[in-house]
Amino acid sequence: DSKNASFCFGQTMVICRLVVGKYPKYRDVIPQNNSNVLKINRSLLLNTVRRVSVCANKASNHIKFDLQSGSLEISAQDLGFSIAAYEKMQCQYDGEPLTIGFKSPFIIEILSNMNCGEIVMKFLDSKRAALILPAEEEEESGKICGIIMPIMIS
């Protein structure tokens, strides 16, 4: 019928309901002209975020990235339990010094689903979405990209 689509794969059948309307212009939400660029090993960043996020507040999962030329410091704290974690690592960073916050599960999710050695994170400022790409596909027209909204940090 005209309201559903079906797909058969061997003995499996998937039936989907068709949505009426115009598909959103998803390319319009991909940040463009980001002047601050971080290049780092994906697994190093992923493992560091996992370690540091253990000390993040369980309700908010906030972590903070402090970016300077040649270094990235990731930190998290839970004032209720008086715990904190800080890890500093070397990286390639081209841009102004920047402090930006993220929810750690979202960073972990994006990095876990990329199959590459190095990633590039592009930022405009601490209030706008960041773009995460495999370093091999640095062009925004690549096959995969992650977009993550920052959080307000104090």
Please place each PLM-identified region on the residue numbering.
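Glycine-rich, pocket-lining loop/helix-strand segments that form or immediately flank
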Residues: 22
